[in-house]
């Protein structure tokens, strides 16, 4: 049975597409079949895949969660379907959350990022959807990182991923290149897969 992972954040610029594609590749490298459903009207994941010859897994455009079954079928029933959602777009985000076995909620560490994340997190918790917060685009020297860790770890409504996605020029330049796993993405992939084994 295909497990659905929806990457959701109502705030833009949090790295949802990068997380979706790079996580898919890291999970694929673990030996699992993956597919990505691109629900963002900007179609960033689709555009990424079209720039790469022999992209390693299928990415398809979707407009609603009812399209997920077609992606799964055409992807030969992958082990994991990762859904890249748009910022805003409440109807699609809601459908994607309801269809998910796990929601990943990427966020930066600025006060505005955390405020928006807590609003989204409260909404997901009201829906009863298993959720993990992923700190993304983070400068490890940032003092806010420790504060955010303490604040989110104290929140028992969602898991906080141990893996932190750092700010790196290389991470910003992956768009349009063939995805390859790195220690950071491999670590996050192991956490995500382990969540389904518990």
Positions of PLM-derived features:
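Structural beta-sheet core signal
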Residues: 36, 83, 105, 133-135
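Inter-motif core of Ras-like GTPase G domains
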Residues: 89-110
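C-terminal boundary of histidine-terminating zinc-finger modules
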Residues: 173-192
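P-loop/Walker-type NTP enzyme "switch/lid" segment
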Residues: 4-14, 21-95, 166-176
């Amino acid at each position: 049975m295909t497990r659905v992972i929806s990457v959701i954040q109502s705030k833009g610029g949090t790295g949802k597409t990068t997380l979706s594609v790079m996580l898919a590749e890291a999970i694929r490298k673990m030996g699992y079949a993956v597919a990505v459903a691109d629900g963002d009207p900007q179609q960033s994941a689709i555009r990424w895949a079209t720039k790469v010859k022999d992209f390693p897994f299928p990415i398809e455009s979707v407009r609603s969660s009812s399209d997920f079954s077609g992606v799964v079928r055409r992807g030969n029933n992958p082990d994991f379907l990762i859904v890249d959602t748009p910022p805003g777009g409440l109807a699609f985000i809601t459908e994607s959350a309801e269809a998910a076995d796990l929601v990943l909620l990427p966020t930066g560490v600025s006060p505005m990022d955390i405020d928006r994340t807590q609003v989204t997190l409260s909404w997901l918790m009201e829906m009863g959807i298993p959720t993990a917060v992923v700190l993304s685009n983070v400068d490890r020297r940032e003092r806010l990182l420790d504060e955010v860790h303490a604040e989110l770890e104290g929140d028992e409504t969602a898991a906080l991923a141990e893996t932190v996605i750092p700010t790196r020029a290389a991470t910003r330049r992956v768009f349009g290149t063939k995805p390859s796993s790195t220690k950071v993405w491999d670590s996050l992939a192991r956490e995500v897969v382990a969540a389904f084994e518990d």
